[in-house]
Amino acid sequence: LKSPVAGAVFFADDACVHPSQLLAELERQATTAGAQLFAGVDATAVRGSNGRAHAVCTSMGDIAAGHVVIAAGAWSAELARTLGEPVPVEAAQGSSVTFQRAEGAPRQAMLLGEDHVAVARYGDHLRLAGWFRIGNRSTAVSDKAVDGLKALAARRLELPPDLIEVNRQAGLRPVTPDGLPLIGTTARWHNVILATGHGLVGLTMGPGTGRAVAQHILGEQPAFDLDRFNPARFHR
């Protein structure tokens, strides 16, 4: 860190994951457990009648369903809209840039609080991520946004001069008006469950959300109280 630094908080249990490696492992474990995954297939609509969804319409045909979980991130509202179900989820664009040859760069994952930049280290790679542009639904990389990330990080960190940029990305975070996710059954469709709107902490809250949704579908007591995340809270 560059001077001056007024203070910092160290969380010994904090960790970071490599996104593509995590997804590969999730795919492996899901298929081992019996899940069917359809790569490159678009879900375009949900069909239903009399308060129950019957099928998910996809680019490879309809898939019959006893329950439908809409966990489509920033696109959840579009999918729910095909059922006439209003879902208050908006997109917030974020950007990231990854460098190689990060010897001498920070070894510990950190958040630069004042600048809202996340710093992650994967072996000899360094990744910077940030920005929260609400209403921007583009997944195109903004050079201005990425250059801004690099400038903010350079103000706070002693970065090696020979860093090699290897990747720029932009993605969409699903956000709700009150900052809390939507987890639970929709108001009009008894077998349609929302699991979206986690904003900046989708990876953190994803496992717990998945378990609670599975328990809800099976008629079990969820691991935590879902009432505060009830999608109907915006329609009361």
Task: Spell out what each predicted region is.
Residues 34-36, 126, 192:
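Short, conserved active-site loop motifs that form the nucleotide-linked donor/cofactor pocket
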Residues 38, 69, 193-195:
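Hydrophobic/aromatic beta-strand patches that form the interior of the parallel beta-sheet core
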Residues 4-67:
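Helical element adjacent to the flavin cofactor pocket in flavoenzyme catalytic cores
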